[in-house]
Amino acid sequence: MDIAIQHPWFKRALGPFYPSRLFDQFFGEGLFEYDLLPFLSSTISPYYRQSLFRTVLDSGISEVRSDRDKFVIFLDVKHFSPEDLTVKVQEDFVEIHGKHNERQDDHGYISREFHRRYRLPSNVDQTALSCSVSADGMLTFSGPKIPSGMDAGHSERAIPVSREEKPGSAPSS
């Protein structure tokens, strides 16, 4: 017999006023004013609305671009050093894995780990792939595309991650 577990009536009635960040990807990074009191911005001015979302690339969400000449992945890895990252190519996939052990930050101790997997286009030259992390923590994985009919060189191999000294970001669309 399944029993539905529900919040107490007062939490259901006031649901919009309770922050729910348990499954948010920003969990553990601290609370913002709008997390605690989201109704304040609308009561102060009906036309003022605090943004509930951070920029896409600041949130750890990746951006993939595939144009005529090249294939590029941009990924925010600001919490990881190049030594914490592993990038490898297997068949038609690139796997990016980041892991750092427990360390202290502003809110206590934290350890992080992520695993991303992307399908490479069949015409990407896998012998010319490169990966770097900019000074501001933006990982850029790229590879040129080859003309149709040429061998793209599919095999498993690790891609070294280099560090750039200048800040980098994804070009705007």
UniProtKB/Swiss-Prot annotation:
For bias type Basic and acidic residues, the affected ranges are 153-167
Binding of Zn(2+) 2 occurs at 107
> Mind listing the UniProt keywords for this protein, alphabetically?
Acetylation, Chaperone, Cytoplasm, Eye lens protein, Glycoprotein, Metal-binding, Methylation, Nucleus, Phosphoprotein, Zinc
Which residue positions does N6-acetyllysine occur at? Answer: 70, 99
Note the superkingdom of the native organism. Answer: Eukaryota
In this UniProt entry, the residues modified to Phosphoserine are: 45, 122
> In which residues is Zn(2+) 1 bound?
100, 102
The residues covered by the sHSP domain are: 52-162
Binding residue positions for Zn(2+) 3: 154
Carries keyword Glycoprotein? Answer: yes
Q: Name one GO molecular function term.
A: unfolded protein binding
Could you tell me which residues carry N-acetylmethionine?
1
GO CC terms for this protein? Answer: cytoplasm; nucleus
UniProt-annotated stretches for the region Disordered: 144-173
Record's subcellular location: Cytoplasm; Nucleus
UniProt PTM comment: Acetylation at Lys-70 may increase chaperone activity.
Per the record, the similarity remark reads: Belongs to the small heat shock protein (HSP20) family.
- Cited function: Contributes to the transparency and refractive index of the lens. Acts as a chaperone, preventing aggregation of various proteins under a wide range of stress conditions. Required for the correct formation of lens intermediate filaments as part of a complex composed of BFSP1, BFSP2 and CRYAA.
Give the multimer and partner information.
Heteromer composed of three CRYAA and one CRYAB subunits. Inter-subunit bridging via zinc ions enhances stability, which is crucial as there is no protein turn over in the lens. Can also form homodimers and homotetramers (dimers of dimers) which serve as the building blocks of homooligomers. Within homooligomers, the zinc-binding motif is created from residues of 3 different molecules. His-100 and Glu-102 from one molecule are ligands of the zinc ion, and His-107 and His-154 residues from additional molecules complete the site with tetrahedral coordination geometry.
Q: What's this protein's name?
A: Alpha-crystallin A chain
- Species: Equus caballus (Horse)
Gene name, please? CRYAA
